[in-house]
Structure formats: structure tokens, C-alpha cells
Amino acid sequence: MLVCGVDEAGRGSLVGPLVIAGVAIKRNRMRELKSMGVRDSKKLTRKARESLYPEIVNMADSYHISRVPPGVVDRSVGRHMLNDLEARYMARVITRLGHGTTYVDSCDVNPRRFGGRVSEMSGRTVRSYHRADDRFVIVSAASILAKVARDRSIERLRKSHDVGSGYPSDRRTVGFVRGYYNKNGAMPPFVRRSWRPARLIEAGG
């Protein structure tokens, strides 16, 4: 019997995509996942995540990674529907994984409501929890896939742009966005214009 986990990475990022990853693995292999050292990606070093990524992929019965472009994120933020966007993409990922109970990390203050949305959209049994990436090893595995995929997206950008970590708390990131805007009179296509730092820069702040 399969168990599925879904998580995101880059939700708060100013630069780059929102990444949704899902993985399906046989229930009787959950202990094996734990013994490999799989846990919440935020508690692992980048080197550890990169090392675990191929191991998780090789163990998985199926997995899927979806990248939501900044422009799509911006349109959802403009309609105050970022949670709905995440639910929709999670549902799409779930339908690619095969049948099995799916655990998701809730971005909604009400996990039951969020799980209900994802379940309705995917037609699958979905259990939604806060901190699911810390509570369920299958979601931890998904969080590692999402985080590595997001980091690789940023690395590709770094080859031609000094974007830093991509997060708005990073002065290097904000400095790059401001410098690019001042030079070109427009935001880079990989920046979320709906995020406060970008709006302030466009407003002359």
C-alpha cells in the first residue's frame, strides 16, 4: 500500500518559482526512510539534502515536482488566493502519484479546510497538518525534493545574476532587484512583483 507526501519550497521567496513536490512510497518502507536520515528539509544541511535526493527518488514508486512561475504566483496574490493556488498545484501533483493516503503540509491556518480543498480537487484521500514535514517522514521526503529543486532553480539564476538566496530577508537579493530595476526600468521576469520589497522598489522606495 502506498503512502504519499506533498510539500512546498520557496513560498516566501522574492525570486524564483514556488516548488511543489510529491512522493509515493510503500508504507512498509517508512522505517527505511527514517534510517536513511530523512527528516524535515529545514533541519538538514544543503549537502545532506543533495545526498538524500537521489536516494528518495530511487526508493519512490512515483514522484512529481511542479514549479509555479513568479507571474502565476503574482496573479494569485493579487486575488488573495495564494492558498488556493498551492492547493490546486498540490492536487495536480497528487494525481500523478498513484492511489494512497496522502499527507500534506498545510499553508492554511485551518488544516482541515485546506485538506478538504486538496481532496476535492484531486479526488484522493488527503490528510492535512501543520508541520507535516516534521511529523511524517513521507512529507519530510517530499520537502527534501521540493527544497533541492528550488535550490537548483536559484543556482541556475545565479550563473547570470547575483540574486543571493532569493528571499526578501537577504540584502543581496533585494539589492540585486533594486539595481536591476534602476538599470532596466522593469523587474526581472523571475521576480515576484506582488511581494512587498518589489512593490516598494517600483514605487521608488
Curated annotation (Swiss-Prot):
Cellular component aspect of the GO annotation: cytoplasm; ribonuclease H2 complex
Compartment(s) where it occurs, according to its Swiss-Prot or TrEMBL record: Cytoplasm
Cite the HAMAP family for this sequence.
Answer: RNase_HII_A
Q: Where is the RNase H type-2 domain?
A: 1-205
Q: Which reaction does it catalyse?
A: Endonucleolytic cleavage to 5'-phosphomonoester
Q: Name one GO biological process term.
A: DNA replication, removal of RNA primer
Output the Pfam families linked to this UniProt entry: RNase_HII
Q: Paste the cofactor note.
A: Manganese or magnesium. Binds 1 divalent metal ion per monomer in the absence of substrate. May bind a second metal ion after substrate binding.
Function summary? Endonuclease that specifically degrades the RNA of RNA-DNA hybrids.
- Organism, per UniProt? Cenarchaeum symbiosum (strain A)
Q: Family per UniProt? A: Belongs to the RNase HII family.
Specify the protein name. Answer: Ribonuclease HII
> Which molecular-function annotation in GO is an example for this chain?
RNA-DNA hybrid ribonuclease activity
Q: What is its EC number?
A: 3.1.26.4
Highest taxon listed in the record's lineage:
Archaea
Traced from the root, the source organism's taxonomic lineage reads: Archaea, Nitrososphaerota, Candidatus Cenarchaeales, Candidatus Cenarchaeaceae, Candidatus Cenarchaeum
User: Which UniProt keyword terms apply here?
Assistant: Cytoplasm, Endonuclease, Hydrolase, Manganese, Metal-binding, Nuclease
**Which cofactors is this protein said to need?**
Mn(2+); Mg(2+)
Give, as one word, the top-level EC class: hydrolase
- Primary localization class, coarse: cytoplasm
Q: Any idea which positions bind a divalent metal cation?
A: 7-8, 105
